[in-house]
């Protein structure tokens, strides 16, 4: 790591801490040449491959936004949505992959959403799984009853 003050290529790490969400590392560094201290933050990037073939960074906010639409008019708090987004991201990152498909993201949303609100689950599943008719809804409802 180059010192941002004097561009010395050799710096020393004096403190390392993992962030609260566990997805980034904060390092406090010192430059032996100019003695200035600075902080770096290291994060790993999780990429999502879309059905169209495009690739974009994973966005917890995008997950929350999609689930929020399914929860519209339901007694679901914003804190619950944020927690669901965190659970989905943790699930995907725990797989140890640098890239996941949008289908895997959708599947990762279903379980925590089902636990949160079954009506919102049915709404989300109907779009995600492309329900064609009442039979698909009935099948999903039967699955919830099991």
Swiss-Prot record:
GO biological process entries: negative regulation of DNA-templated transcription
UniProt remark on cofactor binding: Binds 1 zinc ion.
Residue span(s) of domain ATP-cone: 46-136
Pfam families: ATP-cone, Zn_ribbon_NrdR
Keyword Nucleus: no
NCBIfam families, per database record: transcriptional regulator NrdR (TIGR00244)
Cited InterPro entries: ATP-cone_dom, NrdR-like_N, RNR_NrdR-like
Function summary: Negatively regulates transcription of bacterial ribonucleotide reductase nrd genes and operons by binding to NrdR-boxes.
Name of the protein this chain belongs to: Transcriptional repressor NrdR
Cofactor requirements of the protein: Zn(2+)
Keywords noted in UniProt: ATP-binding, DNA-binding, Metal-binding, Nucleotide-binding, Repressor, Transcription, Transcription regulation, Zinc, Zinc-finger
Zinc finger extent (unnamed): 3-34
One Gene Ontology molecular-function label: ATP binding
Family according to the record: Belongs to the NrdR family.
